[in-house]
Amino acid sequence: MENLDEIRTDIVESTAPLLQESSSESNGGGEFNGASFSGAVFNLATTIIGAGIMALPATMKILGLIPGITIIVLMAFLTDASIEFLLRFSNIGNQRSYGGVMDDSFGKCGRIMLQVSILVSNIGVLIVYMIIIGDVLAGKNEYGIHHAGMLEGWFGISWWNRRTFVLLVTTLTVFAPLTCFKRIDSLRFTSAISVALAVVFLVITAGITIIKLFTDGLMMPRLLPNVTDLSSFWKLFTVVPVLVNAYICHYNVHSIQNELEDPSRIKPVVRSALAMCSSVYVMTSLFGYLLFGDGTLDDVLANFDTDLGIPFGSVLNDAVRFSYAAHLMLVFPVVFYPLRINIDGLIFPTAPPLTSSESDLRFGSITAGLIAVIFLGANFIPSIWDAFQFTGATAAVCIGFIFPAAVILKDRHNQATKRDKTIAICMIVLAVFSNAIAIYSDAYALFKKHTYVYPI
């Protein structure tokens, strides 16, 4: 039984063979000699930059620029430390997956806890992505008020730009093809485009900010938080979950490492991706807050529904919204990849790897089933977002901080230093505190929503 567990450990996440050796490309044709450094960086950066980027300018409004930017940078360093813990104990325990590390430290129970956390977190994230894409392209009804989508604004109301049809076409033409790749490296080009689209949003925001600065002038941004009473003090902590979850990418690190031409370069890959993402985060937060000031909404994308007061403002609004929707479409398959592997690990713990040719039927069935569940959840279960706000917050901090810290504190191989254990304790305290705030904030917002008096 122990041998069986060891075999399955290598399958839990990204079970591609060690790619220093040439292997046939699973997706048809050619030899695969390992992923490039740049492709690995783009895939990891795309895993990091998701929907949360739009909430960062609002954190600057609450914290002020100096503490806000400082915390964004500090969280990048803390994420690097948590990933380094996993990679180091992977090498020590001769494991090639996050699940393998958890299995090595906590046995089968630890591995299953990780798989369930990734299942809950990633299904929730992907459903939210699909909901956001539907909101941007097809519009939504909220509190009895209809918010027109981009397609409706361009072409008027028609059967083909209604929400369900738009998401069905997006699923069949974008999500289905991109989720059919067996190697994450096959997504390197779409990941590069995804990062470029995030930069497009940043460039447009920066450009508008500079134009407004020289034409109308901008208010002086708040450098430090404005704490006037106990309520404003507690409000500072509401941004903690956004910042803590900003860099969660741990479930794809081993998959990317296993496919690298030189797996020993995974640490530079991680640090390059974190440096790139933290730069995008800081610049987006800075320019977004400078542009909208105290009018910055919790989701800055909503600010681009208003008149910007500059020439071609409506065109720029549409460019921002479309680039964001397209960005999420290309993030989708990168987040879907570890979800499929971990679902397979839960349901078929002793089956051959999904990358093998004998697993084609299982691969296709799991892929189709997951896409169907995500599509149905985004379209036909209105309250599903509320549910995943609670479960997703808990699962994400477990994946990013609690599990890596627990591996260090368990220290099965007696390799952790006192400094490692101190950092691990700080991670757990931060994660638990962040999760408690997130659950309280979500519960309070949900209570307010259900007590809202809808207009007649």
Swiss-Prot record:
GO terms of biological process kind: amino acid transport
Query: What is the recorded name of this protein?
Result: Amino acid transporter AVT6B
Kindly give the membrane topology term recorded for this protein: Multi-pass membrane protein
In its UniProt entry, the species of origin is given as: Arabidopsis thaliana
The entry's localization annotation reads: Membrane
**InterPro entries, per database record:** AA_transpt_TM
Which keywords does this Swiss-Prot/TrEMBL entry list? Amino-acid transport, Membrane, Transmembrane, Transmembrane helix, Transport
Where does it primarily localize?
membrane
Enumerate the Pfam families for this protein.
Aa_trans (PF01490)
Q: PANTHER family from the xrefs?
A: AMINO ACID TRANSPORTER (PTHR22950), AMINO ACID TRANSPORTER AVT6B (PTHR22950:SF518)
Regions that span the bilayer: 37-57, 58-78, 118-138, 164-184, 191-211, 236-256, 273-293, 328-348, 365-385, 388-408, 423-443
Q: Which GO terms describe its cellular component?
A: organelle membrane
Family (UniProt): Belongs to the amino acid/polyamine transporter 2 family. Amino acid/auxin permease (AAAP) (TC 2.A.18.6) subfamily.
